[in-house]
Amino acid sequence: MPNHIVLYQPEIPANTGNISRTCAGTDTYLHLIRPLGFSTDDKMLKRAGLDYWDNVKLSYYDSLDEFFEKNEGGEFYYITKFGRHVYSDIDYSDPNKDYFFVFGKETTGLPDALLQKNEENCLRIPMTDHIRSLNLSNTAAILAYEALRQQNFGALLQEPNYDRKIFQD
């Protein structure tokens, strides 16, 4: 049931760091397509990802073409405020499929040509017209958890597993 978050030319290190932490916590693959708007040594990137970077299944690509060549056979969904379909109306429940959620730059989104070519797989998250967009890391988390919800949360812990006990049995 591999789920994948794909960031096309991300610009803000804290967003990518937050997304990496979500990926580590959900066993979701993270794909970064260059150029990145920051160095992978950036303090903000590392701080947002905390000490979870070793648990992130991370791949880098030099272009969209390279990404698609190396990831054939999955279902690709392009997240854009222009999408004709709401993300929650799609079925992500098949455990034998790879689901790729592709996000664009924080400032400009995904290339128009890519969206036009894949119009039927363009998804949006409903929001008011009071803002231009939702935060990238929040949006990635929404998609990751919707896919996991439909997959009954896969191998994620169904019960709390903490050293500290708050509630009595």
Swiss-Prot record:
It is an enzyme of class 2 (transferase). Its EC number is 2.1.1.207. It comes from the Bacteria. It is found in: Cytoplasm. One of its GO terms (cellular component) is cytoplasm. Keywords: Cytoplasm, Methyltransferase, S-adenosyl-L-methionine, Transferase, tRNA processing. It catalyses: cytidine(34) in tRNA + S-adenosyl-L-methionine = 2'-O-methylcytidine(34) in tRNA + S-adenosyl-L-homocysteine + H(+); 5-carboxymethylaminomethyluridine(34) in tRNA(Leu) + S-adenosyl-L-methionine = 5-carboxymethylaminomethyl-2'-O-methyluridine(34) in tRNA(Leu) + S-adenosyl-L-homocysteine + H(+). Gene3D superfamilies: 3.40.1280.10. Pfam families: SpoU_methylase. GO terms for molecular function: RNA binding; tRNA (5-carboxymethylaminomethyluridine(34)-2'-O)-methyltransferase activity; tRNA (cytidine(34)-2'-O)-methyltransferase activity. Its main location: cytoplasm. S-adenosyl-L-methionine binds at residues 79, 104, 125, 133. InterPro entries: Alpha/beta_knot_MTases (IPR029028), SpoU_MeTrfase (IPR001537), TrmL (IPR016914), tRNA_m1G_MTases_N (IPR029026). GO terms for biological process: wobble position ribose methylation. HAMAP family: tRNA_methyltr_TrmL (MF_01885). Belongs to the class IV-like SAM-binding methyltransferase superfamily. RNA methyltransferase TrmH family. TrmL subfamily. Could methylate the ribose at the nucleotide 34 wobble position in tRNA. NCBIfam families: tRNA_yibK_trmL. This is Putative tRNA (cytidine(34)-2'-O)-methyltransferase. It comes from Listeria monocytogenes serotype 4b (strain F2365). The lineage of its organism: Bacteria, Bacillati, Bacillota, Bacilli, Bacillales.
